[in-house]
Amino acid sequence: MESILLEDNPHWNNLSAYDNFISRELLPKAVSYLTTKQILALIGARRVGKSTLAKLMIKELLKTVEAKNIFFINLEKPEFIPYKQDASYLAEIFDNYLKLANPNLSEKIYFFIDEIQIFKNWEVFVKSKYENSNIKFIITGSNSSLLTSDFATVLTGRVLKISVHSFSFTEFLKFKNISYGSRIEQISNKIEISRAKDEYLKWGGYFDVISTDDVIIKKDILKNIAEDIIFKDIVPRYNIKNSSQLKDLFYYIVSNATSSLNYLGLAKKINIDAKTIKEYINYFEDNFLIHTISSYHTKMTEQIKSAKKLYLSDNGFLNLGINRTINNGVMLENEVFVVLNKFCEELTYIKENYEIDFRCENSLYQVSYNIEDEKTRQREFRAFENFDSEKKYKYKLITYDETSL
């Protein structure tokens, strides 16, 4: 146990342990939440950088907090597998930390628990310490159900959530050391920015993917990420019997990203019953592989019943499609979804006489790879005007090169 704790907490002996970590845009927000009493949950898919963000937070804490009052533990370690059904083992881990590190108990302890969903009934342990101890909990998890079923009965009102995603385009530019902040830099680095945009639209923002230039390795990494989520998270959590069927459905969805979803039609095509398809898609959503959006209706019951559109959580997954050349328009539309989904509380599409790709609060978005043809431009704006006769919305036409308002 002691060797595991020391391995996970190099900052106890080396205050510069995390100096080479690449910063994330979410860091200031995450650090600001450290001053609150509530449990902080960093939620997102596997390998988007939740653990890295946690360690960047530790780096900031080390400026004002004693190193041994900061405790990080990764519950995915093989040594913990035999105990994952026993939440009381979490108390044993914490007790071993107290004995080994001997933190200053008169000061707050910052307890980082990575991939907490590994342990069944973990929330009972967290609540017991939360109520009676001077401990700030920061937990990470790879399943959106952490914020619904598990939290609902035990930790309601005690949790603040931050959604963690793969690198944004601006983070990608920083990683590539391409300056873009000023208009002069944007003009001077126009070629480099354009090349980076092409690469980002095609391969997405997973750190391991953008860290290599080999396209074969990129694709292998993306496949490994997707199948780790399927076989390590979804299959055991939901007790899936036919895992190959689940995998096949995911690759079919990848090949049809940005399309409308018809459960009955899909069932006929791939020989899986519609009820099972619906369940599997919910599992993919719970584990941040895909997302669905509904058609906008003024009546919520109609919106819930409407046909869903499918999007991927990261553009890189588009490369895993079956016998498909990736369409530029699909890449751009999926990336626009990824960006809007980060801040839009209720993202929908509109399907009336003309389709509008996205509705977010008081804005309507159309996505077209290019609008050099005047007829194409007129068609896109006609969709806005047809839906919004009273001019209640802002119109945004997004192309590869620009956003028109």
Give a label for each model feature.
Residues L42:
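Hydrophobic anchor at the beta1->P-loop junction of P-loop NTPases
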Residues E2-L6, N13, S144, S149-F250, ...:
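Interdomain motor-coupling "hinge/lid" segment immediately C-terminal to the ATP-binding subdomain
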Residues E2, N69-F71, S211, V215-N362:
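Accessory nucleic acid-recognition modules appended to NTPase machines
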Residues F72-E107:
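Short glycine-rich substrate-engagement loop in P-loop NTPases that contacts/grips substrate
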Residues K50-S51:
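Conserved lysine of the Walker
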Residues M1-T36:
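A short, basic N-terminal segment
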Residues R47:
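Walker A (P-loop) phosphate-binding loop of P-loop NTPases
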